[in-house]
Amino acid sequence: MLFRSFIAAAALGEGFAVGIANGVELRTLWESILNSVGDSFVARHDAPSIFAGHYDPSFSLGLCLKDLGLIGELSTGVGADLPLTRAATHAFEIAAERYGMEAAELHVVKHIEDEAGLSMRLAGDWTPPWEQ
């Protein structure tokens, strides 16, 4: 279910962008997600990396695209359209084109920030996951 985390990471960035663009404070958005059905490992693990602006370099866009490619190959046997997998693949391809294959996975969110002219920095003690 690795592809689920890719979809969730992109969706987290989109949700933050929609909220910020409509005047909702980022901390309020994040707390609302954590206290709703939107809560997930991705929300708790990835959001602080977005807030800190390092985008968690422990996993690259290139690795995301490799895994999404494998999922795409495996999905041919499903016999049904999988639009979320295609959408996630497209979002990560766009980010990789802009920032390079070695850029951190969460550059899929940075792309949204840059395109929309928004900042998802949030003051706080955001200890990187690899230092916890």
Q: Where are these predicted regions, by residue range?
A:
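Helical "substrate-binding/catalytic lid" subdomain
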Residues: M1-E115
